């Protein structure tokens, strides 16, 4: 069988570069086009020396006529750019947007947090997302929507960690929808590759941690609430039933997200033992190969998931505070962005879901 040809726009950025790294080793894809903006005409040997297979490729302009003609098109572009370009792309190609333009279902949420043109919602690329329950009580998941789709919206990295941490408790009614709190320690690659005082100057970043987009302003908040609503078996229009205090904190590491998500226990949760609550998380992720519920007493650490598409998870209870604490550690560029996108792409094309991916991290 011939390999699928792939074009990647935004190829010299962090997200695009991680997509290239994964796809270059994938048995079913052939990277035949890399596109950019300020780097047009430059060799990939300059920008991605860690991917020698791409050394002979030259960055082309990010234009429909360049991207069309490929089986798969990956868009790793700033929000607003993908939406404008997408309508000009081949409807028969599978297009994956790693940006925000096609994630949100409700225009009101987009207008509040992003502004500008609102674009059509695409098939959401988080296979493990719980979307409700079937008649037999088993979970329905977003995975079922992916086979055959031609348009995939890649989730946000902070969204991924927060959702995977808490969704079992939401789906089983163990946590209250109000007063959910998420504190995330985030690696600097999550802030993008543009040179900023707080993100790429070593003298500003080393030995320092910095909160950002605080006070309910972070653009990932509406997407998280949308996912919480779906996990509860509700529509995106009902996401306002949930409230979230969300604080991301940049930490001096290149990759990784450690999410600590807490919520008030419901009366149902208070009747359960700690072992029974843990069993809910175990059941929710049974058969989900990239989801790793760590042994009791072992907490997730970002150092264990670097380079992998896995999420390391844990759940504990604080009976005195009346709260459940759920933890998730992911690689923001892999599981949080490109790895999850390739996983969804595999499903869309009928390939093995884990093709080209690993849940083995690099440690130390």
Curated annotation (Swiss-Prot):
Question: Which residue positions are annotated as catalytic?
Answer: 157
Q: In which pathway does it act?
A: Amino-acid biosynthesis; L-arginine biosynthesis; N(2)-acetyl-L-ornithine from L-glutamate: step 3/4
Give GO terms for biological process.
L-arginine biosynthetic process
Q: Does the keyword GTP-binding apply?
A: no
One Gene Ontology molecular-function label: NADP+ binding
InterPro entries found in the cross-reference section: AGPR_AS (IPR023013), AGPR_type-1 (IPR000706), NAD(P)-bd_dom_sf (IPR036291), NAGSA_dehydrogenase (IPR050085), Semialdehyde_DH_NAD-bd (IPR000534)
Q: What are the annotated GO cellular component locations?
A: cytoplasm
Pfam families the record matches: Semialdhyde_dh, Semialdhyde_dhC_1
Q: Does the keyword Amino-acid biosynthesis apply?
A: yes
- List where in the cell it is found: Cytoplasm
Q: What class of enzyme is it?
A: oxidoreductase
| Cysteines paired by S-S bonds | none
Q: Which domain of life is it from?
A: Bacteria
> Which of UniProt's keywords are assigned here?
Amino-acid biosynthesis, Arginine biosynthesis, Cytoplasm, NADP, Oxidoreductase
UniProt record similarity statement: Belongs to the NAGSA dehydrogenase family. Type 1 subfamily.
Q: What is this protein's function per UniProt? A: Catalyzes the NADPH-dependent reduction of N-acetyl-5-glutamyl phosphate to yield N-acetyl-L-glutamate 5-semialdehyde.
Name the chain's protein: N-acetyl-gamma-glutamyl-phosphate reductase
Taxonomic lineage is: Bacteria, Bacillati, Actinomycetota, Actinomycetes, Bifidobacteriales
User: Which gene name does the record give?
Assistant: argC
